[in-house]
C-alpha cells in the first residue's frame, strides 16, 4: 500500500483529501505543521509527501528544505499543495525542493 504524508493544518482540507485517497486505497499520515511533517517523514518514511505551504510553527517552504537536507528522507518526492497561485510561490516551492506544485 502506498503511504502518503499529508502536511496540512486546515481540517476541511484534511477531511476532503483523506476521504478521497483512502477510497483509492492509499495509507494516509497527517501532520498539522511543518515541524510535525519533518518528524513524521522520518518516523514513517512515506512514499510521497503532500505539503501545504502556509502552516503554523514552520511553513511548508522551510519544512521542505529541511526534509531535503535529511539523508534518510531527502529522496521522497514532495508535491506542494497551496492556494498561493503566483509564479513566485511556485518558484520558491520548487527551489525549496518540491518535485511539483
What label would you give each PLM region?
Residues 8:
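Conserved acidic carboxylate
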Residues 44-50, 55:
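Active-site beta3 strand of CheY-like receiver
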